[in-house]
């Protein structure tokens, strides 16, 4: 295996373009990749690839810190976060920092601290990235064998996989510790309209936790996205963190079995494709979570979900017309169904009208009015509280339906506010990124499989535009 490092000049993809731009072991002549192929030039230069990855981490953390401080600087405490286009402060608020009852921001200092910590971290990462990209050793195998690797070394690759899994498990436990011991997290279901609380009674029953994975993804089932209490969420992170850490230890201590050695492609590009496939699933899952889930993404910070805004509109007009003397239990709508209330396919009492399609919605402002058979008529007549009316009127006018030119809200709602909800931004961006990463997964998986089969020759470069251009130097 020791001889593999010296094969840096050779790579299994044949690329034919002018190699006039020399970059000391990072040019096309020695790597088979031109300057614009980026990190592909560093496939077999573990030290330089480390620099690229550390610098990339620095850019990511710099964005987090800078954007965090930007949001703090622009934040107006009197307005809800979702009306101000914020996407980072809602995450910090959800973790219980700086907020009090009802999701009201009482202290912005923790947000400032978060921004500064990320900014300082990014400087450290940036320095490390530049050091390893420009000054550090080209390869780590000779001087630092623990950090060195050869892509074909299956045992080393699964050891690296194990280390990554342990780090992910520690990350999951950080949330658990925050919820249990370090001030708790924001619970939108806390009595009286949401509050920060410590999560004490964790759900650790495997039947409940893994039951989510077995649920249908449709309708009122909603797969894991349907989770709606923090005990299950934090308990799920205990399970997830434990599985990741135990799996990490397993992968560090063992070598891949024969079936895995045969079934998988063992090359840098193959690992890239596996990672892109995983990130694609993360993106699609995050998209569904932020669009539908109002427990993990509390509506106090992210605005109502689409179904929530629709049900809020029905509730608001039920309240208004009931005050004006309508009998909401028996009033008939234009289609012959109930105007305010009707029955779902399974017999529960639900809101009538167009919002009937969202009858699965669960929201903290609405659940107190439900009985064993859906909405309770006597509670609707006697028990509606002013905070529920205010909350639903607010959500009705803030549906997450804005377009880029910000013609926002439900088309039928004349009081809708013109804004684009963070739910729209986050769901759309994660769907699009999830899709792109999936395409990248297919692309790199195809190339890696072809290279492993020995017939990858790259693209025909005879008519490459770059060939007719003046060399950069």
From Swiss-Prot:
It is a multi-pass membrane protein. HAMAP family: PSII_PsbC_CP43. The modification N-acetylthreonine is found at residue 15. Residues 1-14 form a propeptide. The chain crosses the membrane at residues 69-93, 134-155, 178-200, 255-275, 291-312, 447-471. [CaMn4O5] cluster binds at residue 367. GO terms for molecular function: chlorophyll binding; electron transporter, transferring electrons within the cyclic electron transport pathway of photosynthesis activity; metal ion binding. One of the components of the core complex of photosystem II (PSII). It binds chlorophyll and helps catalyze the primary light-induced photochemical processes of PSII. PSII is a light-driven water:plastoquinone oxidoreductase, using light energy to abstract electrons from H(2)O, generating O(2) and a proton gradient subsequently used for ATP formation. Keywords: Acetylation, Chlorophyll, Chloroplast, Chromophore, Manganese, Membrane, Metal-binding, Phosphoprotein, Photosynthesis, Photosystem II, Plastid, Thylakoid, Transmembrane, Transmembrane helix. Its main location: plastid. One of its GO terms (cellular component) is chloroplast thylakoid membrane. The keyword Metal-binding applies. SUPFAM superfamilies: Photosystem II antenna protein-like. It is found in: Plastid, Chloroplast thylakoid membrane. GO terms for biological process: photosynthetic electron transport in photosystem II. Pfam families: PSII. This is Photosystem II CP43 reaction center protein. The keyword Iron-sulfur does not apply. InterPro entries: PS_antenna-like, PS_II_antenna-like_sf, PSII_PsbC, PSII_PsbC_sf. The modification Phosphothreonine is found at residue 15. It comes from the Eukaryota. Belongs to the PsbB/PsbC family. PsbC subfamily. The gene is psbC. Binds multiple chlorophylls and provides some of the ligands for the Ca-4Mn-5O cluster of the oxygen-evolving complex. It may also provide a ligand for a Cl- that is required for oxygen evolution. PSII binds additional chlorophylls, carotenoids and specific lipids. PSII is composed of 1 copy each of membrane proteins PsbA, PsbB, PsbC, PsbD, PsbE, PsbF, PsbH, PsbI, PsbJ, PsbK, PsbL, PsbM, PsbT, PsbX, PsbY, PsbZ, Psb30/Ycf12, at least 3 peripheral proteins of the oxygen-evolving complex and a large number of cofactors. It forms dimeric complexes.
């Amino acid at each position: 295996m020791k001889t593999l490092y010296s094969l840096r000049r050779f790579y299994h993809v044949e690329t034919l373009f002018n190699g006039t731009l020399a970059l000391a072991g990072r040019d096309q002549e020695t790597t088979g990749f031109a300057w614009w192929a980026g990190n592909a030039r560093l496939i077999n230069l573990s030290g330089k690839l480390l620099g690229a990855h550390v610098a990339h981490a620095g850019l990511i953390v710099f964005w987090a810190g800078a954007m965090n401080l930007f949001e703090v600087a622009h934040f107006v405490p009197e307005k809800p976060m979702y009306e101000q286009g914020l996407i980072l402060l809602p995450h910090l608020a959800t973790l219980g920092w700086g907020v009090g009852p009802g999701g009201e921001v009482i202290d912005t200092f923790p947000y400032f601290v978060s921004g500064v910590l990320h900014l300082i971290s990014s400087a450290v990462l940036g320095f490390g990235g530049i050091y390893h990209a420009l000054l550090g050793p080209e390869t780590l195998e000779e001087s630092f064998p623990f950090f060195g690797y050869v892509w074909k070394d299956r045992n080393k690759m699964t050891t690296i996989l194990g280390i990554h899994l342990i780090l992910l498990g520690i990350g999951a436990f950080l949330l658990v510790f925050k919820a249990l011991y370090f001030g708790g997290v924001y619970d939108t279901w806390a009595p009286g309209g949401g509050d920060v609380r410590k999560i004490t009674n964790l759900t650790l029953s495997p039947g409940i936790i893994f039951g989510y994975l077995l649920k249908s993804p449709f309708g009122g089932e909603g797969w894991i996205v349907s989770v709606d209490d923090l005990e299950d969420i934090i308990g799920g992170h205990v399970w997830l963190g434990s599985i990741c850490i135990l799996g990490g230890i397993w992968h560090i201590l063992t070598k891949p079995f024969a079936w895995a050695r045969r079934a998988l492609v063992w090359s840098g590009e193959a690992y890239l494709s596996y990672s892109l496939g995983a990130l694609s699933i993360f993106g699609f899952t995050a998209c569904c979570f932020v669009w539908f889930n109002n427990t993990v993404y509390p509506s106090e910070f992210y605005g109502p979900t689409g179904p929530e805004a629709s049900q809020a509109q029905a509730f608001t007009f039920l309240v208004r017309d009931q005050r004006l003397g309508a009998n909401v239990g028996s009033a008939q709508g234009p289609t012959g169904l109930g105007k305010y209330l009707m029955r779902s396919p399974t017999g529960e009492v639900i809101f009538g009208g167009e919002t009937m399609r969202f009858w699965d919605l669960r929201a903290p402002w609405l659940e107190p009015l439900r009985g064993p058979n859906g909405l309770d008529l006597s509670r609707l007549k006697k028990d509606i509280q002013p905070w529920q009316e205010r909350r639903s009127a607010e959500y009705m006018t803030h549906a997450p339906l804005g377009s880029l030119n910000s013609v926002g809200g439900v088309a039928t709602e004349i009081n809708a506010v013109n804004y684009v909800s963070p739910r729209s931004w986050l769901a759309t961006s994660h769907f699009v990124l999830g899709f792109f990463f999936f395409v990248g997964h297919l692309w790199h998986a195809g190339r890696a499989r072809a290279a492993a089969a020995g017939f990858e020759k790259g693209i025909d470069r005879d008519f490459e535009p770059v060939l007719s251009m003046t060399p950069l130097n």
